[in-house]
Amino acid sequence: MIVRNEPPITPELVASHGLKPDEYERILKLLGRTPTFTELGIFSAMWNEHCSYKSSRIHLRGLPTKAPWVIQGPGENAGVIDIGDGQAVVFKMESHNHPSYIEPYQGATTGVGGILRDVFTMGARPIACLNALSFGDPSHPKTRHLVSGVVAGVGGYGNSFGVPTVGGQVRFHTRYDGNILVNAMAVGLADADRIFYAAASGVNMPIVYLGSKTGRDGIHGATMASAEFDDDSEEKRPTVQVGDPFAEKLLLEACLEIMAKGCVVAIQDMGAAGLTCSAVEMGAKGDLGVDLDLDSVPTRETGMSAYEMMLSESQERMLMVLKPEKEKEAEAIFRKWGLDFAIVGSTTPGRRFVVRHGGDVMADLPIKELESEAPLYDRPHVPSPQLPVIQARDVAPSLTTADALEKLLAMPELCSKRWVWEQYDHVIGGNTVQRPGGDAAVVRVEDGPKGLALTVDVTPRYCEADPFEGGKQAVAEAWRNITAVGGRPLAITDNLNFGNPERPENMGQFVGCLKGIAAACTALDFPVVSGNVSLYNETNGRGILPTPTIGGVGLLDDFTKSASLAFKAEGHPILLIGDTQGWLGQSVYLRDICRREEGAPPPVDLAAEKRNGDVVRGMIHAGTATAVHDVSDGGLLVALAEMAMADGIGAALDAAPAAIVPYAWWFGEDQARYIVTVHERDLLSVFTKLKAVNVPCIQIGLTGGHEIAIAGERAVDLKVLRQGFESWLPDYMAGKP
């Protein structure tokens, strides 16, 4: 097959497309000839790591994905769960790591835009966004610039589009110096019986291009996301897409309108690999062929080649299969919204993917093989070495308890991230019940009493030290945060960020974390319904910390009965629920106070997580709990300080028990724990009920005053704590020493 004006296919050209020699040989055998330049680009896009999951697919099969409330699991644009009353929640999380490092503002904006499209492609109206951001060491010369650009990009897109950004994570670690992580999650609401899917159906059905015009931005974006970085990575700036939130808002409204009119047979957003991936997936999932005529594609630049049009990742675009009798009605709707509408092809019975341009056939490929016959690798992997348990008595504290608390709260890991989330509109739409800064966001479901509890969680240092326990803990933390606001955890989406899978130690981390995630999801009845894998997060051979971010969704039957972490009044008994051993391995205290980043992380007892969480949720629903907070990073005393600072009510705390050294008691990071306050009148009944179900519970103090006062220790004024807690990040971003 010879096409005019295309470069010859050479080994160098093949390599530049990210294809290994054996993969190219596979293409030659599949076609029985040399591919055209456009076909090479199509294979490069469909067979890269970002689109094909060729290194991860065999391991992803072990995740639990089913439950009675799951309508759609992995494999579609987003996951869908039933929340009753004919309503469904549609949600997913994806990464935009590589583009955000190269061009932080545009990389972040298009990450948000892409995940929003995944949600409304399914027929849902987006109601909330969350994100998890990982940056390098604050002292790295690029970190401040990257933080500024990414945060502005996330806020700029979400605010303009009109969806609240209600929660997230921000972390700093030197292992992200050369590869930041930008993980974006979107959540939407839809009618449970009106979910739209990507699979085309019917022969000779019109395939319609909708939305913004195609340009040269983003070409090879998916391929870039499937390779390591090096010192020249910033030269890849042209591969970063450019987003327009106002165009996306128009696209949302137009799509929802034609869905309501019954025009749509199948729909797929143009994300990674653009027109190529959307058309191939639509046809292959429907067991049909696709015939595209690129002469009909709306373009914003002159002289674009077939190769460029097929691989462009210009934003705010959709591909649909329409009912033929609804073409004119659909076109009128899109014209009304000022968006492009063009019939660019049709479905065919031949299971071929044919691309035409300027009178030439630029590509003629077997469509199923493009999608389902991508290389599948069971890459070598080695387990991470088992690290020793750190004995608390072997740790020499360098600071008093009070001094350590003040220092920890004024450091990057635990300081307030208000500077970040105040740049996001977290209340637009008027349905945000609990704002950022708590355990989980709570968003009201319109036209009823229900609410959604939303969170994103992961502790990468645990995953590095013990991938299996780290994977379990990421899920357990999401489950715990949803529980702490009164939500019933329903399902998760995951964003699996790892280094180069061709290194056995990295692949071992991936496999270990995935096994931990699967174990926790199974034990907690918390299925995975969508997700994303981002590999090759390395620069010059130095990989990120393994970061399997978990996005959790839970349901509250009555959002007015949600719990929050703030102490509500003086004189409330403070209860610690869960077992405390004083586990210091991989704790923030050990790392930031003792300068020791070592040891085994805390083990996660999933039975205890389930038992303790169910009890706490029951206390919230019964109206017994007046404040609730889970214990995680920084341990017990940090969690207590956060509760006190939230509303300016202090606490008088008992001394640590004699069996545990004080710094391990206050700063250990044992799992499956909650702090709950109750009215004095309910104390005896709470102890009785928890003892009956074998849930550990002790009283550790009383709320009151304006300081954190531990018996036998120096008291710490809340104003002093808040000053350090609130000032580190704005001071850092302002360049203050």
From Swiss-Prot:
Pfam families hit by this protein: AIRS, AIRS_C, FGAR-AT_linker
Binding site for substrate: S95, H96, N97, H98, R117, Q241, E313, S314, Q315, S534
UniProt: Mg(2+) 1 binding residues: E94, N532
Residues holding ATP: Y53, K92, D494, G531
Keyword Cytoplasm (UniProt): yes
Enzyme nomenclature, EC number: 6.3.5.3
Keywords of the record: ATP-binding, Cytoplasm, Ligase, Magnesium, Metal-binding, Nucleotide-binding, Purine biosynthesis
Pathway(s): Purine metabolism; IMP biosynthesis via de novo pathway; 5-amino-1-(5-phospho-D-ribosyl)imidazole from N(2)-formyl-N(1)-(5-phospho-D-ribosyl)glycinamide: step 1/2
Protein name as it appears in the record: Phosphoribosylformylglycinamidine synthase subunit PurL
Source organism of the structure: Nitrobacter winogradskyi (strain ATCC 25391 / DSM 10237 / CIP 104748 / NCIMB 11846 / Nb-255)
